[in-house]
Amino acid sequence: IVAIKDHINLTGNNPLIGKNLDEFGPRFPDMTEVYNLKFRALAKEISKEYFEYKEGVYAWFTGPTYETPSEVNFAKTIGADLVGMSTVPEAIVAKHSGIDVTAFSLVTNLAAGISDSPLSHEEVIEIADKTSKTFQNFMRSFLGQINLAI
């Protein structure tokens, strides 16, 4: 389980493309701190009871295929610690709307080129199932105390 501290959008897409709705947020929102620092500090403290806390930069790919070894290498070269197919568009929209954001990524497999084993969706599901109870308990505790960070 890794707390996301920043992201890199490698999709060539952005959920804010199109007409801006000013009532939701500015045309060009600041993305300096998408992932709330106070929330991450709280998560770090609470995680001590559940798992070793780690933070990382998440690179967003479109999917639905797993990334190639070259894509993973490129992401690593430009500063990414994790790769995946989710999270970033929701974080962008939330930040645009003035919502404080925190995000966690469950690392379910070693990306292509890191391991000699072929990637398997079944393995991803299996690891997610094994970790789900720990993550649920952590999130209950985190959400129960989040008002302390606001």
What are these regions (language model features)?
Residues 1-118, 122-150:
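Glycine-rich phosphate- or other oxyanion-binding loops that anchor nucleotides, phosphorylated ligands
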